Design a protein with these regions (language model features):
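Conserved alpha/beta-domain cores
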Residues: 92, 516, 526-876
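Residues forming the flavin
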Residues: 462-464
Length: 876
């Protein structure tokens, strides 16, 4: 019989695939002898089974759950559903990868009207008993029955207003009892049935709800962004309650062993007295700093410090812990490797190496390459910042600079950002439902919540700027406005926020490019030491090339020459070429562009200082270059000595029904060989000039023919290139080597790579087009149906962002396996956008690519991902 349920005493940290991160770590803390309230974990396999069984918990799993409850009763001396000595539990999710706030939690399960009355009497603390019950009704209604939290929050706010108090803790036992009754009435009105009183029914409902939350919209978005497969499922942890809300000698907190924003070594966190754990994370009350716990609970704080040291040494990483103090006694509810900003990740990794806890290789493997992106984000201009006066200040919860127009809802943030507006999302507090809006916003500002609130944790994970807990803001969400320092801000007004200092400014403060910190250099040097694959960049201008070189690029893997045709007056000459009727006319027009292209290439070679440069010849269909407005059409007609109607006829003739599969790429060079001749002259002449100026540089142009699907196409265009290049080199009397290769972006090219490799010096996978043609859908139109594919679980990722290793990847592997035996000197790279995606880089390493090429700002990501792939392979 399959084992679906494990007691905490039966597991350990190595079982995270089965028990989820939270369950595995609770088991590990139990084995370390730490004070963990006992319980059990229902496995991730049970979650998968739940979905296979049509979202039902089968009898076998249910029996094992009830058996585990009986074991818990034996350990705790309490009884589930008993009036006199009830066992109350929490039910929490726990996937194998940490997903803060994405799935659901229920506390105080096992309560009903009878039990709460006995608890109130026996504990001599009716306020605590009714507080637990009203929280349970609210959480169960929201999580299990999907009755929105807001209905209950409105009842709480109404009650506080009537009682003239501002905080939940100021409500009396009688108030909370009345609230519990109001909550049950609300539940009955929304659901049409009484609130469940049977603890077993409550438990099964809660477990189902946690399994169900694996498939909620916010979890799906988070998984897609963080490469977490749907098939993993989530575990469920059922744990005896420890109560932080029994009075002033109780409390709850969240703490990190190091600062998750900066990486500084020292306890960082927050604490609330007389509260339950969700209060800290949800950001409903703004908590006190963890250091204040020492005055309140000296013994528990001393023990907590020891636990922190034990856990960090044990896991050899910064830990994020949840804990509760019940009548002065410490209970550990969770530990996990803490989410951190990119800046903190680098510092922590370097410090752990310096402290002897980690090797260089382990430090490189610890860092999520995607987060490096945020280090290269702009910061506020120092002079402008100095001149600006902050209107107010919150907590600098996630570093960076953000400015934009104020919006008050996640939906508005998505909508405004979609039309190109930069926005700052301003909320009372964020909830997990806000994740899409948080992604779309430049930054997040909240009125409530601390450094460990949902907004702070998620923003740090996404690399977004966040200021939380600015209590000076008077918020009016309904009318979409807030007031700060006497000034009223409406939707669309501009503000700037500083996620490092927590300062809030009126208007837009200019930003400057970020400078790269010392730890960044150390980690990158280690990455370069261990990686075996080269990293190039996709760059069309000397400025891009220079930036990429600063960020560690070792060459250009793709220079798109068509972008150069749009510079200055060149477009006029190119349009003349398109509208010419004879070869001579076309050559005359191209002759005007030749010196300009040559100059561009010289600047690129100079910027690359002898490192390889791959130049792709003209690729887009000609219709992309022709004029569309009347003035430009007339200008072209005059230059050509033609009528406007004649030019319009030529433009109309270029129209294609499917231009991305039409007259483009090498097909242009076959139709108009003079274009390939001109581009070859420009490439070779530029290389000759730069080689003369820098004799010590290894200048070897790589000419790339796009969209080849047949060996005969490549032969035809290559002959034009080689004849032209050899003539130029002979005329100059120099010794210059060059290479002619092709892009593999048509499936047929991959299937016949053994033929193509006979003529090509190199292959470069153009995975944007290869993905498009393998799937048979357009990159520009896929957005119309991809969301439906995600919802239907057909796709988990956008195949244009994350390489499809099963189909497109198989074609790539096939091309290499066919091509290399025919041409052992064949070098192979990738230059699609996938070249900067970590999982795609890892795949490229596995199938033996020589290099990846990506946009300049993704170069550090690719360097780190390439190193991680090499380290993983070595340690496999």
């Amino acid at each position: 019989m399959a084992k679906w349920v494990y007691m905490f005493t039966e597991g350990n940290a190595t079982m995270r695939n089965l028990l989820g991160g939270k369950g595995a770590n609770l088991a590990e803390m139990t084995s370390l002898g730490l004070p963990v309230p006992q319980g059990f974990t229902i496995t991730t396999e049970a979650c998968t089974q739940y979905y296979e069984d049509g979202r039902q918990i089968n009898d076998e799993i249910m029996a094992q759950i009830m058996e585990a409850i009986t074991k818990m009763e034996g350990v705790t001396g309490k009884k589930f559903g008993d009036k006199e000595n009830p066992l109350l539990v929490s039910v929490r999710s726990g996937a194998r990868a940490s997903m803060p706030g994405m799935m659901d939690t229920i506390l105080n399960l096992g309560l009903n009207e009878e039990v709460v009355n006995v608890l109130a009497e026996k504990s001599n603390n009716p306020r605590w008993a009714w507080d637990c019950y009203r929280r349970f009704i609210q959480m169960y209604s929201d999580v299990v029955m999907e009755v929105g939290k807001k209905y209950f929050e409105e009842l709480i706010d109404k009650m506080k207003a009537e009682r003239g108090v501002t905080l939940d803790v100021d409500l009396t036992a009688e108030d909370l009892q009345e609230l519990a009754n109001q909550f049950k009435a609300e539940y009955k009105e929304k659901i049409g049935a009484d609130f469940p009183t049977d603890p077993k029914e409550q438990l099964m409902g809660a477990i189902k709800a946690v399994f169900r939350s694996w498939d909620n919209p916010r979890a799906n978005v988070y998984r897609r962004d963080n490469d977490i497969p749907y098939s993993w499922g989530t575990a469920v942890n059922v744990q005896m309650m420890a109560f932080g809300n029994m009075g002033d000698d109780c409390g709850t907190g969240v703490a990190f062993t190091r600062d998750p924003a900066t990486g500084e070594n020292g306890l960082f966190g927050e604490f609330l007295t007389n509260a339950q754990g969700e209060d800290v994370v949800a950001g409903v009350r703004t908590p006190m700093h963890i250091s204040e716990m020492e005055q309140k609970f000296p013994e528990a704080f001393k023990q907590f410090n020891e636990v922190c040291n034990t856990l960090e040494k044990h896991y050899r990483d910064m830990q994020d812990m949840e804990f509760t103090v019940e009548h002065g006694k410490l209970y550990m509810l969770q530990t996990r490797n803490g989410k951190r900003t990119a800046q903190a990740a680098l510092k922590i990794a370097c410090d752990l190496v310096d402290e002897g806890m980690r090797t260089e290789e382990e430090a490189v493997a610890m860092i999520d390459p995607r987060n490096l992106d945020t280090l290269l984000h702009p910061q506020f201009d120092a002079a402008a910042l100095k001149a600006a006066t902050p209107l107010g200040r919150g907590l600098g919860a996630s570093p960076g600079a953000a400015c934009g127009k104020v919006v008050f809802s996640a939906d508005d943030a998505v909508e405004w950002a979609a039309r190109g507006e930069k926005v700052v999302l301003v909320r009372l507090e964020t909830s997990p439902e806000d994740i899409t809006g948080m992604k779309s916003a430049q930054g997040i500002l909240t009125v409530r919540g601390g450094m460990t609130s949902h907004a702070a944790v998620v923003a740090r994970g996404m690399g977004s700027c966040c200021v939380s807990g600015c209590g000076d803001i008077a918020m009016d969400e309904e009318n979409k406005k807030f007031t700060l320092a006497g000034k009223e801000f409406h939707e669309g007004d501009a503000i700037s926020i500083d996620g490092t200092t927590g300062n809030i400014y009126d208007g837009i403060i200019p930003t400057v490019d970020a400078t790269i910190a010392g730890e960044f250099g150390r980690i990158m040097a280690w990455a370069d030491k261990y990686r075996t694959m080269k990293v190039r960049t996709n760059a069309d201008t000397p400025a891009d090339a220079k930036k990429a070189r600063e960020l560690g690029a070792e060459g250009i893997g793709l220079c798109r020459t068509e972008h150069m045709f749009f510079e200055g007056n060149r477009i006029d000459a190119f349009r003349e070429m398109i509208c010419s009727e004879t070869v001579e006319e076309r050559e005359a027009a191209l002759e005007k562009i030749l010196p300009e292209q040559q100059g561009d290439f010289e600047k690129l070679y100079e910027a690359l200082e002898g490192n390889p440069v791959t130049i792709r010849f003209l690729d887009p269909p000609l219709h992309e270059f022709v004029p569309t407005d009347e003035e430009d059409i007339k200008k072209l007609a005059d230059a050509q000595g033609k009528t406007v109607d004649q030019i319009k006829t030529i433009i109309d003739s270029l129209h294609e029904f499917n231009p991305m599969m039409g007259h483009r790429g090498c097909r242009l060079a076959v139709t108009y060989p003079e274009i390939a001749k001109m581009q070859t002259k420009a490439v070779i002449r530029a290389a000759i000039n730069v080689k003369k100026a820098h004799a010590d540089w290894n200048v070897c142009p790589e000419i790339m023919i796009p969209l080849v699907g047949d060996i005969k196409e490549l032969k035809y265009v290559k002959k034009v290139v080689v004849d032209t290049a050899d003539a130029e080199i002979a005329a100059a009397g120099v010794d210059l080597k060059y290479e002619v290769g092709t892009m593999i972006e048509i499936p047929r090219a991959a299937l016949t790579a053994d033929e193509i490799a006979k003529e090509a010096d190199f292959f470069c996978f153009g995975t944007n087009d290869l993905t498009q043609m393998t799937y048979g859908f357009s990159r520009d139109d896929a957005g119309k149906f991809l969301n439906a594919y995600y919802d239907a679980k057909i796709f988990e990722n956008d195949p244009f962002a994350k390489l499809d290793q099963v189909g497109v990847g198989k074609l790539m592997k096939m091309a290499i396996e066919l091509g290399k035996p025919v041409n052992p000197n064949l070098h192979v790279g990738i230059c699609g956008e996938h070249g900067g995606d970590p999982s795609s880089v890892e795949f490229c390493h596995k199938i033996g690519l020589n290099y990846v090429s990506c946009s300049p700002f993704r170069v550090p990501i690719a360097r780190l991902a390439a190193a991680q792939a090499a380290i993983a392979e070595k340690n496999a």
